[in-house]
Every structure is written in structure tokens, then in C-alpha cells.
Amino acid sequence: IYIFNCDLLKKYLIEDEEDPNSENDFGNNIIPNLLRDNRKMYAYHFNGYWKDVGTIPSLWEANMEVLDPEHSGINLFDENWKIYSRNSGMTGHRIGEDAIVEESMVTDGCNIQGTVKHSVLFSGVTVEKGAVVEDAVVMGRTTIKSGAVVKHCILAENVMVEENAVVGQKPADGSVGEVATVASNVTIGKNAKIGPNAMLYEDVKEGEQHD
């Protein structure tokens, strides 16, 4: 988090934009330039959880760390440091009789009839019977239909994963690796296969493959 004098920030941003060799980055350009000019700067030493989520793998990793508060240091259930968020107004989540849910965060409005392991599910997600979700971040109102497999990926809002489609792949070496991503309102057709490097912004037709 940065707090700037507005006029000063504007001056340095304009200068940075005019520099053809700049990376246009706060940490690599703006802050060093302020130091170069001996501008007054103050830092607050923060000991709690913090993570830069400037990349897709780091965003995925941050969500996975929510599931492991003992090691990551972030605990959403800490009464002494509450984290407030918007309430969707949906009903409580529903877990089917034959559903399997392990080490996951399932929020309001979700309907889980399949298998969910080590994943974060936002409000209103549906996982049909026979579907598998593992090591995934699934955002609001997304539907994963019967027989579909979703692993090691991020699905944005209102995504539809049709029957027997496969999205993402867990790295064999256990690393963060590549994280497949699917943008909002995209439909993944039946039997489609989406590789671990894929970044999808448009619908995928039945049976198609994307690496």
C-alpha cells in the first residue's frame, strides 16, 4: 500500500511515462526515483500476512494459503482481526448426501453434489454430481457440470464447464507451476480439454483442446 502526495505522484508518473527505458513499475521505477531525488519517505513495518498478487499464479497461491492458516499466517476466523466483506444475500451452502468436501472453503449459495478438495468456492457455485474440483479457485455463480474435472486453475464469475470437460492440470512436482485461467461468462463445451497454460477469454466448443 502506498500513500502519496497527489501533486508529487503526478509529477513522477508523467516523468516515468516519458522515459522509454522505464518498466512503469512503482517498485522498480517510481520509488527509486523518489529516493534518487531525496524525497521524504516513511515506511511502516508490518508483521502480518501480506502477499503481492500481481500475477495469476500468485493470486491462486494466495487463495490456497487461506486454506492453511497455520503455515501461511492468514486466518479468516481470527476474532481479533476480522475481515469484513460483502454479503451476497444468498442462502447457506448445500452439501449433497454423496458429495465429498475436503479442506476447502465453500461460501454462501453454493450447491455441492460432487467432489471438492483443497479449493476456494465463491458465492453461488454449483458442482454437480460426478464433477471434481481440486486445488482450484472458483468465483461466483460458476457451474461445473457432471463428469467435469477442474484442477489447479482459476475460474472467474459465471463460467459454465460442461459435462466431461477437463480444465487445468496439477503439476507433478507439487510446485505452483502454470495456472489455467478462464475469464468471466465463458462456456467450456462438453469433452473439451484445457491445458495448464491456457488463458481463455472466449467460449470453447465441444471437444476442442487448448494448451
Q: Whereabouts are the PLM-identified features?
A:
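Short glycine- and hydrophobic/aromatic-rich loop-to-beta-strand nucleating segment
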Residues: I1-F4
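Left-handed beta-helix
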Residues: D7-L8, E15-D211
